C-alpha cells in the first residue's frame, strides 16, 4: 500500500506534556460549581476522552455553553503558560520521525484538539513549522475526534487521491476511532500517552508502537 499523507497527533504522540493537559483541565473546571465527587467524575471523563475537541469536552462536563467557553479559555491560558515556560517538549524520536517521513516524499499533518491559537503557539515554541505541511484543529475541520473530519480535511487540503493513502497515528482511543472512520490505510496507536496496548488494539489500531519513532519504518520511510 502506498501512503502519501501522515497525520500525527500532538500531545501524547509527538509532544510530551507530563500531565500539563490534565492539570490545565483541572484548573479550568475548579470553582465552577462542581461538588468534590462531581470534580472527580469530571476528571475521569477528561481522561476517557483524551484526544477529543477540548471545547466539546467542557460542554459535556459543564452543560452550560457559556460556562464551557469560559472554562475552555481558562484551559487555553493555563496550557499556553506551560508552553511559554518550556514545560511542553518533543517526545524522543518525534522530530526525526517527521523529518524521515517528509524525506520519503510524504506530507505531514499534525492534528490536535487544541484551538488554532494554542496549536500555533505550540508549533512556534517547538520550532516545528518547517517540519510539517499542515496543522489542523477541530475549528478547521468541523468536528474533532473521534469523528473523521480532521484526517479527511488533511486529505483534501494536501491533495490526496484516496483515503487509503492516509496514515494516522495517535495515543488515544479517539485517535484510533477517527482514523478508522476516515478509512485510513494505516491507523497506528502509540504507548507514549499512557493508553494500554490492549485498549488501543481493542479500538481497532492496525499497529501498536512503542512510540512515533517506529512510524517511518511502517511507511517505508
What are these model-derived regions, one by one?
Residues 45-46, 128-144, 165:
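A short, structured active-site edge motif that brings together acidic residues
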Residues 81-110, 116-120, 148:
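Short, acidic loop-to-helix structural element flanking the phosphoryl-transfer center
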Residues 151, 164, 199-221:
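Short acidic, glycine/proline-enriched helix-loop-strand junctions
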Amino acid at each position: 500500500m502506498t501512503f502519501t499523507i501522515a497525520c500525527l497527533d500532538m500531545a501524547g504522540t509527538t509532544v510530551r506534556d507530563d500531565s500539563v493537559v490534565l492539570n490545565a483541565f483541572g484548573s479550568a473546571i475548579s470553582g465552577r460549581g462542581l461538588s468534590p465527587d462531581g470534580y472527580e467524575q469530571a476528571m475521569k471523563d477528561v481522561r476517557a476522552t483524551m484526544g477529543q475537541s477540548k471545547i466539546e469536552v467542557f460542554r459535556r462536563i459543564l452543560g452550560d455553553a457559556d460556562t464551557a467557553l469560559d472554562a475552555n479559555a481558562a484551559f487555553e491560558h493555563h496550557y499556553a503558560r506551560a508552553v511559554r515556560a518550556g514545560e511542553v517538549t518533543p517526545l524522543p524520536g518525534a522530530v526525526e520521525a517527521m523529518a524521515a517521513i517528509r524525506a520519503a516524499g510524504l506530507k505531514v499533518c499534525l492534528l490536535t484538539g487544541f484551538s488554532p491559537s494554542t496549536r500555533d503557539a505550540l508549533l512556534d515554541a517547538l520550532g516545528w513549522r518547517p517540519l510539517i505541511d499542515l496543522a489542523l484543529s477541530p475549528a478547521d475541520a468541523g468536528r474533532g475526534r473521534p469523528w473523521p473530519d480532521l484526517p479527511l480535511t488533511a486529505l483534501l487540503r494536501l491533495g490526496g487521491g484516496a483515503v487509503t493513502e492516509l496514515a494516522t497515528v495517535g495515543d488515544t482511543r479517539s485517535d484510533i476511532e477517527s482514523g478508522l472512520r476516515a478509512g485510513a490505510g494505516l491507523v497506528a496507536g502509540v504507548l507514549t500517552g499512557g493508553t494500554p496496548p490492549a485498549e488501543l488494539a481493542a479500538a481497532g489500531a492496525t499497529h501498536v508502537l512503542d512510540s512515533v519513532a517506529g512510524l517511518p519504518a511502517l511507511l517505508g520511510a
